[in-house]
UniProtKB/Swiss-Prot annotation:
The keyword Protein biosynthesis applies. SMART domains: EFG_C. This is Elongation factor 4. One of its GO terms (cellular component) is plasma membrane. GO terms for molecular function: GTP binding; GTPase activity; guanosine tetraphosphate binding; ribosome binding; translation elongation factor activity. Its EC number is 3.6.5.n1. It comes from the Bacteria. InterPro entries: EF-4, EFG_III/V, EFG_V-like, EFTu-like_2, G_TR_CS, LepA_C_sf, LepA_CTD, LepA_IV. It is found in: Cell inner membrane. Residues 14-196 form the tr-type G domain.
Length: 610
């Protein structure tokens, strides 16, 4: 009786609902998903764990959703009919917005979950607009209604004023206790439109996500738009033209459940023994080899990395394992960009592109945990546009690739438009923070207790620790959403860090001339604390070109060579001290200083002292 005879073989598309949940971090999205799975009997009581869909350890520890997941559930509504609900989970953090747009492309509707105590947040707003742009039906839901500080009336007016959705009929629920969750499922069946599609048309399936399984090869999560795909069919990947035989199709309930076929309107997985990692790229279209579709489905926008950093294995023996790990991760995470890079200080590694600082942390943590690698990362940097004296335009994502100063005519830095939603009480500190970060105010709109402030801020100022500072000055109430706006001319310089008069290429940074002196001083001070003491003095210098702007010294450890002299002539002591001094000088010429990982990260964490 699997899925009630597959809902009469899914001939009735009117009984399928594909939806996502849109919510800010901590507004209860994963808990609501758990309740849906419980009510629809997807898992038994014993198999339930909190945040079922957050399958990675990192997701549970940090309490955030990183990867889009999918579950197919059977729900018997009050009208007596059984509906198939395909729920695609989405992340809430600003760094993972591309995951959200991918999930929404496979849906007809979305549930907007807003915390009844905290109200609307900037990232929720951004995702909600994406859903509305894609013509999805959005159902507002107020969560955490049982909290003593819940203010449903205020939040309803916020949803109407800020987002512009009619929220008078917003369903009030408590995902934790299960109160009102059935009403959400009923509203979902009643209001979200069924998928359009023709089971008899040639197959068109959109790849929403792919990941690598060491036994099965590439597993693709697909939304069937038209047609059907069965086990044993020969399918073709439309962008590459390669054909593969389908070994297995099925759905997640949330356990992987094999089926004979997937039909139009459904969301499920396909395994076709694809062993090469780029065999089924995300956003591509699958069709059948014998009866192919004419045109490719519109995919997703390719996301451009915003932040670049070098990642290097601590042991050079791990380089090949690191290359394989990156290839497998990039299949699962389409926004991860990487290319080989070598550094004099760190050896061979990769230059990787990320969507933001959280994305970078998560990728490094996943590489270290899932593939047992020890990695060193260099300070993150954004992409700068350089115009040379010859009139050429270059894009530079690595400070060590910057041409010599005489060859540079103009330098441009990327500017982002940041939309910050903040309660009125914290407006002052937020404006101060934005001005500190060289921000220019674009607009300010009051709605209820909240203020929406829009600033144009250099991206290099946003990607370091702007998000953390924003949260701390507003006690966690402010929320941020940003996107790239333009390149703008700026007075930028390359600052080198010298250790014992040797330039360390991996520590170079591009900074604004006005803040170069204070930044150089902070980096030198921080490095002084982090570099262990040696048998000789270690000089740490920050330099712009040949001009030294800051210096700190890590004092040498020294042995008391005069301890064995008891009395006697002072020249005896002096002779021993001179001998020690000469030895130290010789050691300094050949000595090699080990730089710990924390020192590399210090280059961009200097702001945290402010």
């Amino acid at each position: 009786m699997l899925f009630a005879r597959r809902l009469e073989q899914l001939k009735d598309l009117n009984r399928i609902r594909n939806f996502s949940i849109i919510a800010h971090i901590d507004h209860g999205k994963s808990t609501l998903a758990d309740r849906f799975i419980q009510i629809c009997g997807g898992l038994t009581e014993r198999e339930m764990s909190s945040q079922v869909l957050d399958s990675m350890d990192i997701e549970r520890e940090r309490g955030i959703t990183i990867k889009a997941q999918c579950v197919s559930l059977n729900y018997t509504a009050k009208d007596g009919k059984t509906y198939l609900l395909n729920f695609i989970d989405t992340p809430g953090h600003v760094d993972f917005s591309y995951e959200v747009s991918r999930s929404l492309a496979a849906c007809e509707g979305a549930i907007l979950v807003v915390d009844a105590a905290q109200g609307v947040e900037a990232q929720t707003l951004a995702v909600c607009y994406t859903a509305i742009d894609q013509s999805l039906t959005v159902l507002p839901v107020l969560n955490k209604i049982d909290l003593p500080q819940a203010e449903p009336e205020r939040v309803i007016s916020e949803i109407e004023d800020i987002i512009g959705l009619d929220a008078q009929d917003a369903i009030r629920v408590s995902a934790k206790s299960g109160l009102g969750v059935n009403d959400v499922l009923e509203a979902l069946v009643a209001n979200i439109p069924p998928p359009k599609g023709d089971v008899h048309a040639p197959l068109q399936a959109l790849i929403i996500d792919s990941w690598f399984d060491s036994y099965l090869g590439v597993v693709s999560l697909v939304r069937i738009v038209n047609g059907a795909i069965r086990k044993g069919d020969k399918m073709r990947v439309m962008s590459t033209g390669r054909a593969y035989e389908v070994d297995q199709v099925g759905i997640f309930t949330p356990k992987r459940t094999k089926l004979d076929a997937l039909y139009a309107g459904e969301v499920g997985y396909v395994v076709a023994g694809i062993k090469e990692i780029q065999g089924a790229p995300v956003g591509d279209t699958l069709t059948l080899d014998r009866n192919p579709a004419d045109k490719v489905l519109p995919g997703f926008q390719r996301v451009k990395p915003q932040v670049y950093a070098g990642l290097f294995p601590v042991s050079s023996d791990d380089f090949e394992a690191f290359r394989e790990a990156l290839a497998k991760l990039s299949l699962n995470d389409a926004s991860l960009f990487y290319e080989p890079e070598s550094s004099e200080a760190l050896g061979f590694g990769f230059r990787c592109g990320f969507l933001g600082m959280l994305h970078m942390e998560i990728i490094q943590e996943r590489l270290e945990r899932e593939y047992n690698l020890d990695l060193i990362s260099t300070a993150p940097t954004v992409v700068y546009q350089i115009v040379t004296q010859k009139g050429e335009t270059l894009l530079i994502d690595n400070p060590s690739h910057l041409p010599p100063t005489p060859q540079i005519k103009e330098m441009y830095e990327p500017i982002v438009r940041a939309n910050i939603l903040v309660p009125q009480d914290y407006l002052g500190p937020i404006i101060t923070l934005c001005v500190e970060r060289r921000g220019v105010q674009v607009s300010m709109t009051y709605s209820g207790r909240h203020v929406s402030v829009v600033y144009d801020i250099p991206m290099s100022e946003v990607v370091s620790d702007f998000f953390d500072r924003l949260k701390s000055v507003s006690r966690g109430y402010a929320s941020l959403d940003y996107n790239f706006q333009r390149f703008q001319i700026a007075d930028l310089v390359k600052m080198d860090i010298l250790i014992n008069s040797e330039r360390v290429d991996a520590l170079a940074v591009i900074v604004h001339r006005d803040s170069a002196h204070s930044r150089g001083k902070l980096i030198a001070e921080k490095m002084q604390q982090l570099i262990p003491r040696q048998m000789f003095d270690v000089a740490i210098q920050a330099a712009i070109g040949s001009h030294i702007i800051a210096r700190q010294t890590v004092k040498a450890l020294r042995k008391n060579v005069t301890a064995k002299c008891y009395g006697g002539d002072v020249t005896r002591k002096r002779k021993l001290l001179e001998k020690q001094k000469a030895g130290k000088k010789r050691m300094k010429q050949v000595g090699h200083v080990e730089i710990p990982q924390e020192a590399f990260m210090a280059v961009f964490q200097t702001d945290k002292k402010k």
